[in-house]
């Protein structure tokens, strides 16, 4: 067995099969079982009582995590004139219009998030087959299609994450780095859960948040007792 396999099995052995932990216990386990030589990302998987096949039960949104994500986010803004300047002044890594559309068509993808002013979406939409599958297409529902580019850039740089429920009814979202420690990760998770609850569809009946699991990049999943979220 490889060393990596042994490390993972040792970490998994610390997590009791079938047990649902309190959020604080789960975070302590996630940080304790992270053994990679890099600063692992911590991800939350939230299982919801919705049917994403129904348009009126789609859950999609964004939230600015209070402690950020612990990584540098490269932001591209599609804008012209004064809005282009506002974007750059706010900290955008790249801002412009047609020149960046052509670069992307040629294979350039050295950015992590994309923002666009509404008047640019006619041209940006032509990049749908490139940006869409990568989750990079700007969308007004998450605030990335806006004339207020300065605020949008600052929020993304500060740790804004976008999320949407998948076909299986699960929302996946990063919530920070292992190096944050349990307390800062807790604050980020609270912000995420509060936003997901705020976006509960009116047509969702029964239990809304059915389960939560936390894990680091290379670590085992740790299940959280949804009832513990009542204390958030």
Swiss-Prot record:
Q: Which domain of life is it from?
A: Bacteria
A GO cellular component annotated for this chain's UniProt record is: cytosolic large ribosomal subunit
> Which GO BP terms sit in this record?
regulation of translation; translation
Annotated GO MF terms: rRNA binding; structural constituent of ribosome; tRNA binding
InterPro entries according to UniProt: Ribosom_uL1_bac-type (IPR005878), Ribosomal_uL1 (IPR002143), Ribosomal_uL1-like (IPR023674), Ribosomal_uL1/biogenesis (IPR028364), Ribosomal_uL1_3-a/b-sand (IPR016095), Ribosomal_uL1_CS (IPR023673)
- Residues folding into a coiled coil are none
Enumerate the Gene3D superfamilies for this protein. Answer: 3.30.190.20, 3.40.50.790
Keyword set, alphabetical order? Repressor, Ribonucleoprotein, Ribosomal protein, RNA-binding, rRNA-binding, Translation regulation, tRNA-binding
Similarity field: Belongs to the universal ribosomal protein uL1 family.
What is the role of the protein in this entry? Answer: Binds directly to 23S rRNA. The L1 stalk is quite mobile in the ribosome, and is involved in E site tRNA release.
Description of how the protein assembles with itself and partners: Part of the 50S ribosomal subunit.
- What name does UniProt use for this protein? Large ribosomal subunit protein uL1
Native source species: Syntrophus aciditrophicus (strain SB)
């Amino acid at each position: 067995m490889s060393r990596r396999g042994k490390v993972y099995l040792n970490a998994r052995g610390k997590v009791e099969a079938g047990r649902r932990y309190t959020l604080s216990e789960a975070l302590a386990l996630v940080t304790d079982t992270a053994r990679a030589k890099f600063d692992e990302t911590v991800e939350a998987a939230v299982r919801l009582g919705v049917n994403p096949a129904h348009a009126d039960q789609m859950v999609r949104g964004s939230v600015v995590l209070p402690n950020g994500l612990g990584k540098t986010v490269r932001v591209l803004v599609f804008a012209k004139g004064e809005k282009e300047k506002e974007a750059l002044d706010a900290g955008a890594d790249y801002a412009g219009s047609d020149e960046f559309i052509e670069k992307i068509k040629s294979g350039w993808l050295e950015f992590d998030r994309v923002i666009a002013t509404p008047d640019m979406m006619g041209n940006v939409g032509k990049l749908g087959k490139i940006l869409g599958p990568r989750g990079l297409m700007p969308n007004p529902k998450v605030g990335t299609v806006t004339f207020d580019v300065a605020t949008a850039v600052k929020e993304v740089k500060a740790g804004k994450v976008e999320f949407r429920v998948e076909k299986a009814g699960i929302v996946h979202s990063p919530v920070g780095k292992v190096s944050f420690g349990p307390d800062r990760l807790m604050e980020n998770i609270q912000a995420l859960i509060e936003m997901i609850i705020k976006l509960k569809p009116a047509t969702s009946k029964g239990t809304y948040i059915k389960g939560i699991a936390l894990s680091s990049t290379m670590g085992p999943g740790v299940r959280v007792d949804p009832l513990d979220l009542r204390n958030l």
